[in-house]
Amino acid sequence: MKRRLFFSCCCLLFLMAGCDQGKPKEIDVKLHNASGDEVGTAKVAQQTSGVKITIKAEGFTPGPHGIHVHEIGECKAPSFESSGNHFNPDNKKHGLLNPKGAENGDLPNVVADGSGKIKAEIDAPHIKLEEGKTTIHRKDGASIIITENADDGMTQPTGKSGGRIACGVIVKKASDLKKK
């Protein structure tokens, strides 16, 4: 009798584990520079409110750099323009200092230390891995872009943050997933 109960409980746990196989709760992203070299990683993890993005990268000019989540999961070097604009399903204006609220993909600047290394943890409360309006699991996917200069938090449309110097695909475009 105990064996049957144990077996039944194991089967139930196995079935319940399969029910939570929807969207991932964490995504590892490889960051590449304009030459195609891997320069680091970003980990995007679902939290109670939004996501936490953990960046570990190197090879950057020391000082502050803008970082944003972009609306397309594609990183065609060298310009990374294929990643589109900032992720913005709430249709806000650019800038964390914007009094009417920022775009969903606007993030605080990251800082490269004297040796060009970036280590940062960023809370992104207006982005989700889970279902909903602000999910980055969409047909166009999403990407992370690091820019050559700091984002000033206000200037439209990109905060005077300069060119895109690193990119990583968080979620691929649906059309790219079908090609595999």
Whereabouts are the PLM-identified features?
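Bacterial N-terminal signal peptides that target proteins for export
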Residues: 1-7
